[in-house]
């Protein structure tokens, strides 16, 4: 039966999103300290650039400035490499959610005629219609996709040659997160769970 297949697909998708959201949150939690470390390093590197080395006692140590720069740059590159690994984790979640949501949408397209428009639009007193649940799943997929893209673009702009931008990374990241609230995912999953629990798809 189309309705039973649809319910099974929705249930599997909800479980997949819940699993992937936990992985997403774990990856995101690692970003703030790494970006904070990069911001701190950038501040130190800018301060070292401004320092009048020749007119200070440190000027007696001819290679100190270059050694310090290499050490700081190496630390920045190591933090960026770690962030790259975390970004790969975000990409894996994005892809897994896209696959799960895509499977549900394809099934609906295949079985839409059999399900009928009335079934797709029928709502319970406390749960959404199937059409609303499908729209919510697309919102979830879009949330992960857009936030992943923002994280990718943020890291692409980072360079030891642009220390002011690197120093502002923690604030830039916070502004991004403010635009992508995690409750977008939670609310949609709760609504989908209600739909399944109250057997609006049966």
Provide a role label for each language-model segment:
Residues 1-44, 202:
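N-terminal alpha-helical scaffolding segments that mark the starts
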Residues 17, 24, 62, 164-166, ...:
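Intrinsically disordered, low-complexity regions enriched in Ser/Pro/Gly/Gln/His and often acidic
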Residues 99-202:
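Charged, alpha-helical coiled-coil and adjacent rod-like segments in eukaryotic scaffold subunits
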Residues 4-11, 35-139, 164:
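Extended, amphipathic alpha-helical coiled-coil scaffold segments used for oligomerization/tethering
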């Amino acid at each position: 039966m189309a309705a039973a297949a649809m319910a099974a697909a929705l249930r599997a998708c909800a479980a997949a999103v819940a699993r992937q959201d936990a992985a997403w949150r774990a990856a995101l939690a690692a970003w703030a300290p790494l970006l904070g470390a990069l911001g701190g390093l950038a501040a130190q590197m800018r301060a070292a650039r401004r320092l009048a080395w020749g007119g200070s006692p440190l000027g007696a140590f001819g290679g100190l400035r270059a050694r310090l720069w290499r050490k700081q740059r190496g630390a920045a590159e190591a933090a960026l490499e770690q962030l790259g690994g975390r970004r790969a984790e975000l990409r894996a979640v994005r892809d897994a959610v896209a696959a799960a949501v895509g499977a549900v949408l394809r099934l609906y397209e295949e079985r839409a005629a059999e399900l009928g428009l009335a079934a797709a639009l029928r709502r319970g007193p406390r749960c959404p219609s199937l059409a609303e649940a499908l729209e919510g799943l697309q919102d979830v997929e879009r949330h992960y996709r857009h936030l992943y893209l923002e994280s990718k673009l943020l890291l692409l702009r980072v360079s030891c040659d642009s220390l002011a931008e690197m120093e502002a990374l923690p604030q830039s990241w916070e502004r991004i997160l403010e635009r992508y609230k995690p409750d977008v995912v939670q609310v949609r999953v709760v609504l989908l769970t209600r739909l399944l629990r109250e057997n609006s798809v049966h």
